[in-house]
Every structure is written in structure tokens, then in C-alpha cells.
Amino acid sequence: MVLFLLLVALLSPAGEAGKIIGGHEAKPHSRPYMAFLQFKISGKSYICGGFLVREDFVLTAAHCLGSSINVTLGAHTITDQERTQQVIQVRRAIPHPDYNDETCANDIMLLQLTRKAEMTDAVSLINLPRSLEKVKPGMMCSVAGWGQLGVNMPSADKLQEVDLEVQREEKCIARFKDYIPVTQICAGDPSKRKDSFLGDSGGPLVCDGVAQGIVSYGKDDGTTPNVYTRISSFLSWIQRTMRQYKNQGSA
């Protein structure tokens, strides 16, 4: 069964350490671009990840679309009210116009914030790839998030991270019937059981300091590899959309 990697918002108690599958706790604020999203779908609360790409825009997965979206920047322990945190509401959620919730195609969304985030040591932007830049099989990347620690396990209260290897496209083509190599990336580490899991949706796949992918979907048993939206295939849409709303909703 394929599932999106979002999660009902049931955070573990503060002080309870955990991991993304096969990962470890990140150094506090070592990923200052990370965003924690809370939103509602049909009255239920969910969480996703995201990342800051402009002072007033967060990039995430389109399947993280819901109502009353709140963005927390500058967090490490998400259950604490840390001084570094900036909580900002979303003015406008802009999923890709060709997003397909049945095949998971074009799973990308921009969130315009109601005000610009203040740039600090704990809050900053991450670079996006160049147009049509491709990651290659064998390349080491990483993901981070506050998602579920494993099958039937709680979500993390502290930011977790894990190193992943970009896999050959054939692995995801065989594993997922709707995998699209042109707009998606296959990543994980089947031999070591490392990957993103529930609640990590929308977070970045980071390769050499550049956000190359967005956590999209995988199998519900926590096995790897998983599918990531290929950001380089959507650069023109990202740039065009942010230009369109450049002077709207920024403090």
C-alpha cells in the first residue's frame, strides 16, 4: 500500500528522544530552513514538514494542503516554546495546478506567509537547484523532520535527520506503479532501512546543501526506497508563482 507521509498530530511527550527510521537527533538549529506545519483536514489535525525558500514563502508537498495552516520556523524541540521559534500563519496555499492526489504526480506546494520571517541563526533560507539539475544514483543526501519514528511508533518531539542514498530509477519504477522519473527522485537505503516516514511529508531532500527533493510518499510498512518530488523540474513554476505574489502579504 502506498501512503502519503503526513501524520495525525500526536506528538510524543517532551524529553522523549527518537529517530526518523535509522536516523538520529539533529544538532539544534543546524537546519535553520526547516518548517513545521500544522493543519486540519476534515476536523483532524495533521503535521508535515516544509522549508523556507524566501522570507515569505515555504515550499512543501501538495498533499499537505489543509485548513488553518500554521508554520513554525526556528524550532528544534517542537513541543517546547523555544525563544528561537517564529509561528506564522499562512496567507495563501498554492498547490501545483496539475497535482494529482491519486497518482501523487506534481506533489509540490508553495505557502505564502502572512509576514516575512525574521532571518536569525535559527531561521534562514535554503538554496534551490539550478534548472534541470539532476541528482545521480549513489549520491548521498539527507532528510529531516519531526515525523513518526517507525511503524506503530510515536512522532518525534526533537528534529531528526538521516542520510539517504539516491537510488536507480528502476527501483522505484518496480516498486510504485505511478513513479515518474522526470519529476520524481527515488531515494532511501533498502539494505540499511533508513528513510523518511509518516509526518516527514513536505520536508526537503538535501544534497550538498541544496534542496533537491520534497518528501512525497512511500510504503506503509516503513520499507525503502521512497519517492521525492524533483524540485528542479518545477523551478519555473516556483519562480513564476513567487513573482506573482511578490508584493502581496509581506510585512
UniProtKB/Swiss-Prot annotation:
Catalytic residue positions: 63, 107, 201
CDD domains: Tryp_SPc (cd00190)
PROSITE patterns: TRYPSIN_DOM (PS50240), TRYPSIN_HIS (PS00134), TRYPSIN_SER (PS00135)
Keywords associated with the record: Disulfide bond, Glycoprotein, Hydrolase, Protease, Secreted, Serine protease, Signal, Zymogen
KW Metal-binding (keyword) present: no
Gene3D superfamilies in alphabetical order: Trypsin-like serine proteases
Gene Ontology CC terms, in alphabetical order: cytoplasm; extracellular region; intracellular membrane-bounded organelle
Maturation propeptide residues: 18-19
Annotated TM spans: none
Family under the similarity heading: Belongs to the peptidase S1 family. Granzyme subfamily.
UniProt KW Aminoacyl-tRNA synthetase keyword: no
Residue pairs linked by disulfide bridges in the UniProt entry: 48-64, 141-207, 172-186
UniProt protein name: Mast cell protease 3
Pfam family, one: Trypsin
Residues listed as glycosylation sites in the UniProt record: 70
Record SUPFAM superfamilies: Trypsin-like serine proteases
GO molecular function list: serine-type endopeptidase activity
Chain ranges of the Peptidase S1 domain: 20-243
One GO biological process term: proteolysis
Organism: Ovis aries (Sheep)
E.C. number(s) listed in UniProt: 3.4.21.-
